[in-house]
C-alpha cells in the first residue's frame, strides 16, 4: 500500500495556510500547517514529511534559517519557498542551499503543484 505524501506548510498567513490545505487535500495529499518555524520544530518533524512549503518572512526564525537548521538536523526534506519577498539574492541563496523552487505569492496553483511533483520525484 502506497502512503499518501505529507506536505507541511509553514506560513504565518492563516488564510494562505487554509487555502493551501484545501488545495493540497483536494488533489490527494495529507497536509499539516504551522504558523511559525518554531511551531514546526516543536512538533518534531518526522521522516513522513515529503515536502515543506515555506515562507521566507516568518515571525521569529525566518524560512532561510529554518532551511539551514533542517539541513543540519533532519537531512534533506525537499523545500519549496512561497514568498511575496523573493529578490534575486534570496532566491539564489535558497536554491544554493537546496530548495526545489522559489515561487512568488500569489502563485498559480499549477506552478505550485508542478513544483511539488518535482520535489516528490526520487532523486
Q: What would you call each of these model-derived segments?
A:
Residues 17, 59, 87:
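The feature encodes the CheY-like receiver
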Residues 89, 107-117:
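C-terminal output helix
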Residues 64-75:
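Short amphipathic alpha-helix used as the core "switch/output" element in two-component signaling
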Residues 52-55, 83:
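Active-site residues of response regulator receiver
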Residues 14-32, 119:
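Two-component/phosphorelay signaling modules centered on CheY-like receiver
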Residues 65, 86-101:
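Alpha4 helix (beta4-alpha4-beta5 surface) of REC/receiver domains from two-component response regulators
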Residues 33-51:
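Acidic, metal-coordinating helix/loop segments flanking the phosphotransfer/catalytic sites
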Amino acid at each position: 500500500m502506497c502512503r499518501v505524501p505529507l506536505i507541511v506548510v509553514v506560513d504565518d498567513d492563516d488564510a494562505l495556510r487554509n487555502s493551501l490545505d484545501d488545495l493540497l487535500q483536494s488533489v490527494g495529499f495529507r497536509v499539516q500547517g504551522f504558523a511559525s518555524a518554531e511551531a514546526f520544530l516543536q512538533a518534531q518533524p518526522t521522516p513522513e514529511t515529503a515536502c515543506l512549503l515555506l515562507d521566507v518572512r516568518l515571525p521569529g526564525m525566518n524560512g532561510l534559517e529554518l532551511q539551514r537548521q533542517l539541513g543540519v538536523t533532519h537531512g534533506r526534506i525537499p523545500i519549496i519557498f512561497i514568498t511575496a519577498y523573493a529578490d534575486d539574492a534570496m532566491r539564489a541563496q535558497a536554491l544554493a542551499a537546496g530548495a526545489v523552487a522559489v515561487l512568488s505569492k500569489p502563485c498559480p496553483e499549477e506552478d505550485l503543484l508542478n513544483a511539488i511533483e518535482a520535489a516528490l520525484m526520487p532523486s
